């Protein structure tokens, strides 16, 4: 039997007979469990190194070698723990850190879609195949996902309820019964009832509630679980509650036990292991896709994306209100509980997060729900190609020159208030450098004849390399995705391509080398500075440059059409110049691609505060032709500044850029602030990155405020009052309006006002003497 499917989860375990891999996949015919038994864990060792092997392990000579030419042997083990013990003994091994299930898939070029050939047997509500033949295939899954959310008694360990909502799709829209299949399990003795699209079901105690939820999930059989902080809170709580009650957490397919792996290091994430079901956290997926919000709370994100939010929003009120509802009005608590699930589903649909996750897995070969993992993704793509070229790679951290490489080039800016600034941007600069200049670990180790020079004495092979070809494939795929308006795929490819430099520049990469990283970043510096010189030779000053962009001032008098003509001509001529320059200097084809990106009709480049020099990575402007305001790095774009400063600065920029009166506006805001009319805009919101007790000296204001709460979370909302910092939920004192004048409004205004030969103080001093 042949069946096309999509990998959801992957696990391995040692058995007396050898290593066993367990893969779960979804297909048009249902879930599939693939058991691959009698596998031999493998790694490599330099042939000249003597090694004492554990019983049952075998050492075989291979035709492969290390990148610098040393011949290697393969080491084959009965169990993965034997390989790990040898690795922990300090033996110098190669690729011993590659997980066996990842190696099995990557060497077959299987990423997520998979063709299964073999004998498939029905086991309950899923298929099982033992020792199937697997190969890559083009297959697009239709994931059935379930949003879950729990309610508890504040910070105690008491469980109140669990809500679960199936994400709507074409199937649920067509079937009225499926549209009403969501559920809330609630501890209590009330009558079960259908409440709109969900059913409220009461259970006598926590154990009964959890088992009812597990049974319902097994019957519903989703391919993935979703939620908001679903691993760190919901699943972690459920797993720990099961442990305390002495029951298995039967959330996996086939009733397999789910676990949550706790972090080994501070700041590391918890990892959910739910056999047969991917687990997607909405916060993590949005961040992986480079979405940006003032706050990633469910209430804030849903308001920004959907225009609606939770039924209870205030953090302090929320705990008390949930406790009250559980005591007095359980149906209302159920409404609140299921509402969170509905919001999660709607956010996933609005942001197309499942499509992004699927495309990312298709590109990288990482597990569907694994986020981060840029180094592992690089290994998945690079190692199989390296092996086929005849080489193996070292372990991570087995070699390092210990030196870093410079970051992206940021040009000194020319501060001022401008008309008509054009931005020329190098499209995917670092990937295009890798492709153009053949930056590659194998090409660095084996440069061959007539190599291409890099930096830090690096030389790169012109023809025997891997990474430039990978970039070329991804580049073409992204261009195709853009043409087909496939935004999730285009974004996923962009993220993967841009991650390659970061991977080569980190000591967590097995190929890390200062020569590799510097040959990318220092080439980028050269490209930006030489492009600046060429543009200025054409008669246009470059007022700023940042990693992959140059900002060109073309004079005050150009209209929109003239600006576009100048921008397009600079783009075309600079591309031609780079093609000719690289052909003459290195005899290579340029894959550098300059784009005319933006015309700022008005542009502001500030100084460093209190100094005459121009700042970096901070500017604002109006983009023509629709006069859209863009703010980068300034107060209006920073979430650690108050809404007061951010709103004030944006409006001030609008007035200055449109040459409208602004003095009266500044006076009005200062007056409203002093009169207490803007108090709702005075809230600071900051993240708490350490335990409160860790702050001993110079305790910052947000920690002072957090210490006044009975319980603090990872973020704190507070005001500066006449009695110091106070949390929003326990504010008793009047705001310190002078603080907000001096520390919020004045800095937000003075950056641009200095170029108009005035200041916040000059405009407001006479007025404020009345207060």
Residue ranges of model-derived segments:
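C-terminal, non-catalytic extensions of nucleic-acid polymerases
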Residues: 568-571, 575-771
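Catalytic palm subdomain of template-directed nucleic-acid polymerases
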Residues: 550-570
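Active-site-proximal helix-loop-helix substrate-binding element of RNase H-like nuclease domains
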Residues: 182, 192-200, 204, 221, ...
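DnaQ-like (DEDDh/DEDDy) 3′-5′ exonuclease domain used for proofreading
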Residues: 1-221, 338-339, 343-362, 366-407, ...
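Proline-aspartate-enriched helix->loop->beta-strand connector
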Residues: 213-237
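Short Gly/Ser/Thr- and Asp/Glu-enriched loop/turn motifs at secondary-structure junctions
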Residues: 68-70, 544-549, 587-591
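Short active-site loop/helix that positions an aromatic residue
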Residues: 234-244, 427-441
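Common nucleic-acid-contacting/processivity interface regions adjacent to the catalytic cores
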Residues: 319-428, 432-437, 487-526, 530, ...
């Amino acid at each position: 039997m042949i069946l096309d499917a999509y990998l959801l989860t992957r696990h391995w375990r040692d058995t007396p007979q050898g290593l066993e891999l367990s893969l779960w996949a979804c297909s048009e015919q249902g879930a599939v469990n693939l058991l691959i038994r009698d596998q031999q864990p493998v790694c490599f060792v330099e042939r000249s190194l003597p090694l004492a092997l554990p019983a049952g392990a075998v050492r075989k000579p291979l035709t492969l070698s290390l990148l610098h030419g040393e011949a290697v042997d393969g080491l084959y083990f009965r169990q993965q723990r034997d390989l790990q013990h040898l690795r922990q003994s300090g033996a110098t091994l190669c690729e011993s850190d590659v997980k066996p299930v990842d190696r099995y898939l990557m060497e077959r070029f299987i990423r997520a879609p998979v063709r299964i050939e073999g004998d498939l047997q029905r086991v309950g509500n899923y298929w099982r195949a033992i020792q199937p033949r697997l190969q890559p295939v083009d297959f697009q899954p239709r994931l059935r996902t379930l949003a879950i959310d729990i309610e508890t008694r504040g910070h105690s360990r008491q469980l109140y309820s669990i809500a679960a909502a199936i994400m709507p799709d074409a199937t649920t829209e067509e079937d009225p019964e499926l549209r009403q299949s969501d559920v809330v399990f609630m501890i209590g003795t009330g009558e079960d009832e259908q409440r709109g699209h969900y059913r409220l079901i009461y259970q006598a105690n926590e154990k009964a509630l959890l088992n009812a939820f597990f049974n319902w999930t097994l019957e519903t059989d989703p391919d993935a679980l979703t939620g908001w902080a679903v691993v760190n809170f919901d699943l972690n709580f459920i797993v720990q509650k099961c442990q305390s009650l002495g029951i298995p957490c039967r959330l996996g397919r086939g009733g397999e036990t789910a676990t949550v792996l706790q972090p080994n290091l501070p700041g590391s994430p918890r990892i959910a292991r739910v056999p047969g079901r991917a687990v997607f956290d909405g916060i993590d997926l949005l961040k992986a896709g480079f979405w940006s919000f003032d706050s990633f709370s469910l209430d804030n994100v849903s308001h920004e994306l959907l225009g609606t939010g939770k039924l209870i929003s205030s953090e302090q009120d929320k705990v008390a209100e949930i406790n009250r509802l559980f005591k007095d009005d359980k149906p209302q608590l159920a409404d609140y509980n299921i509402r969170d699930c509905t919001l999660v589903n709607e956010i996933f649909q609005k942001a197309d997060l499942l499509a992004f996750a699927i495309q990312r897995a298709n590109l990288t070969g990482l597990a569907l729900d694994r986020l981060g993992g840029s180094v592992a993704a690089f290994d998945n793509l690079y190692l199989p190609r390296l092996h086929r070229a005849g080489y193996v790679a070292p372990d991570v951290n087995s070699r390092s020159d210990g030196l870093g490489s410079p970051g992206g080039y940021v040009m000194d800016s020319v501060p001022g208030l401008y008309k008509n600034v054009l931005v020329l941007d190098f499209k995917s600069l670092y990937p295009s450098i890798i492709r153009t200049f053949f930056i590659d670990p194998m090409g660095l180790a084996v440069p061959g004849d007539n190599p291409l020079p890099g930096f830090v004495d690096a030389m790169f092979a012109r023809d025997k390399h891997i990474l430039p070809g990978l970039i070329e494939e991804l580049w073409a795929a992204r261009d195709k995705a853009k043409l087909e308006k496939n935004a999730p795929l285009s974004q996923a490819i962009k993220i993967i391509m841009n991650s390659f430099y970061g991977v080569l520049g980190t000591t967590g990469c097995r190929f890390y080398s200062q020569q590799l990283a510097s040959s990318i970043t220092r080439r980028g510096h050269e490209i930006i500075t030489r492009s600046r010189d060429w543009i200025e030779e054409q008669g246009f000053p470059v007022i700023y440059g940042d990693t992959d962009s140059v900002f060109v001032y073309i004079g005050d008098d150009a209209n929109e059409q003239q600006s576009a003509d100048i921008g397009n001509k600079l783009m075309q001529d600079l591309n031609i110049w780079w093609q000719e320059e690289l052909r003459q200097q290195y005899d290579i084809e340029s894959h550098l691609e300059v784009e005319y990106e933006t015309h700022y009709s008005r542009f502001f480049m500030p100084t460093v505060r209190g100094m005459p020099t121009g700042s970096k990575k901070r500017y604002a402007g109006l983009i023509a032709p629709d006069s859209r305001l863009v703010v980068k790095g300034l107060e209006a774009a920073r979430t650690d500044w108050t809404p007061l400063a951010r709103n004030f600065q944006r409006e001030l920029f609008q007035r200055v850029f449109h040459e409208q009166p602004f003095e009266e506006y500044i006076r009005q805001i200062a007056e409203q602030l002093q009169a207490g009319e803007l108090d709702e805009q005075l809230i600071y919101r900051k993240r708490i990155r350490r335990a409160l007790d860790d702050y001993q000296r110079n305790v910052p204001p947000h920690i002072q405020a957090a210490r006044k709460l009975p319980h603090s979370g990872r973020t704190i909302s507070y005001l500066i009052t006449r009695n110091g910092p106070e949390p929003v939920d326990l504010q008793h004192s009047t705001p310190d309006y002078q603080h907000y004048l001096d520390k919020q409004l004045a800095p937000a205004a003075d950056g641009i006002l200095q170029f108009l030969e005035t200041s916040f103080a000059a405009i407001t001093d006479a007025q404020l003497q009345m207060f």
